[in-house]
Amino acid sequence: MAEVEERILRIKQHRGVIGLLIVDENGKVLRTTMNKQDKEQNPIQIAKKVTELAKKARSVVRDIDPQNDLTFFRVRGRNKQEIMVAPDKNLYLIVLQRTDFDEN
């Protein structure tokens, strides 16, 4: 468990990271660094939508090559945010990150 905590802390310390979610295959939030009461970036809604997208992306990868599997994907929106997803067999690691931070 300490190893998981260390990794979460390390990810959170990256520049621009808004939040991190660990989600099960049904979109249930198991762990988050985000405020569950946030109406604009509600982690429960993010988890549901991103797991749906990840399942579709995994299906596309497998349709193209049945021997292959989705290991990571990133989506960048116009709002200068990225959603990065690392799917595993039963879990998804989702990281939200701002991309508009100052480069200096």
Task: Label the predicted regions.
Residues 1-104:
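Non-catalytic interaction/Regulatory regions outside core domains
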